[in-house]
Amino acid sequence: MRQSKKLGQCFLKDKNFVKKAINRAELTDKDIVLEVGLGEGALTKELAKIAKKVYVIELDERLKPFADEITSEFENVEIIWSDALKVDLKTLGFNKIVANLPYQISSPITFKFLEEDFEVAVLMYQYEFAKRMAGKPDTKEYSRLSVAVQYNADVEFICKVPPSAFSPKPDVNSAIVKLTKREPKYHVKDEEFFKKVLKAIFQHRNRTIKRALIDSSHEIGIERNILKEILEKIENKFEFTERVFKTPPEKIGYLSNLLYDEI
C-alpha cells in the first residue's frame, strides 16, 4: 500500500524501537492502552500481547486489511475509524498511550492527551519537536511548547530514531518521548490566560519579558497602553528585565497570575 503524504504516514518497521517504546511504557495485563495510527500493525500486535485492551484510532480505511488481520488474531484490539482529534477520548477509559504519531498533528494531539487522566504516554515525534518538548530554560530548545507540556507532565527524552526505522523513510530524524502525567508543580489562576501569555512572550523569546509582552499585547487581549500601565503598577513584583528564554516556567506562571489579577 502506498502511504499517504497528506496523512503524514511513515510506518515504524524496526522492531527494536517498537520494543523500546513498549518497555518504557511498563505495560501489564491490567493496562488499557490507546494507540493513534495503526500503520501496518507492528506496534499494535506487540501491545495486544501484553495489555488488557488496546484501542487504535485510525483515519485511513485503506488500512482495513491490516486491521482485520490483527482483530482476528487478538480479541482485545478495537479499531476506531476516525480522526483522533475529533474522538471523545474520555469514553475510552485508557490509562496508557503508546503511539507512532502522525507528525502533522503532533502538537494538537499532545495537548488533547494532556487533558485526559492517563498515567504514562510513550510517543514518537519528529526529533526537533521532541527536543523542544523537553527543553529547559536558557537553552535553544526552550519554548512555548516546553512550558505548556511540562505544566502537568514530566517529559523524558528516550532516544533518537533514524529514518531507516520507518517505511517510507521520512526526511527527518525522529525521537521517542515519555510523558508522565502529574499535578502541576505551580498554580495558575486561569489556564487559558496562561496559554495566551505563553504565546505572547515566546513570539519574542530573546527579548525581555516586558518588551515581549508589550510587542504582543494583542495576544493576551489587552491594549498596549493599558498593558504598559499594568506593568508599571506591578513592576516591583516581577523581574521584567529577564529574557524570555531564561525565565523558568514557575515564574511565567506567577507572571500570568499577576497580569490576570489586573484585568
Curated annotation (Swiss-Prot):
Family matches, as PROSITE patterns: RRNA_A_DIMETH, SAM_RNA_A_N6_MT
One cellular component (GO) term of this entry: cytoplasm
Function summary: Specifically dimethylates two adjacent adenosines in the loop of a conserved hairpin near the 3'-end of 16S rRNA in the 30S particle. May play a critical role in biogenesis of 30S subunits.
Molecular function GO terms recorded: RNA binding; rRNA (adenine-N6,N6-)-dimethyltransferase activity
Localization, UniProt: Cytoplasm
Pfam families: RrnaAD
EC number, as in UniProt: 2.1.1.-
Protein origin, superkingdom: Archaea
SUPFAM superfamilies xrefs: S-adenosyl-L-methionine-dependent methyltransferases
Main location group: cytoplasm
Annotated protein name in UniProt: Probable ribosomal RNA small subunit methyltransferase A
CDD domains reported in the protein's UniProt record: AdoMet_MTases
Residues annotated to bind S-adenosyl-L-methionine: 12, 37, 58, 83, 100
NCBIfam families: ksgA
SMART domains in UniProt: rADc (SM00650)
Organism annotation: Methanococcus maripaludis (strain C7 / ATCC BAA-1331)
Keywords: Cytoplasm, Methyltransferase, RNA-binding, rRNA processing, S-adenosyl-L-methionine, Transferase
Family, as annotated: Belongs to the class I-like SAM-binding methyltransferase superfamily. rRNA adenine N(6)-methyltransferase family. RsmA subfamily.
InterPro entries with a match to the protein in the record: KsgA/Erm, rRNA_Ade_diMease-like_C, rRNA_Ade_Mease_Trfase_CS, rRNA_Ade_methylase_Trfase_N, rRNA_adenine_dimethylase, SAM-dependent_MTases_sf
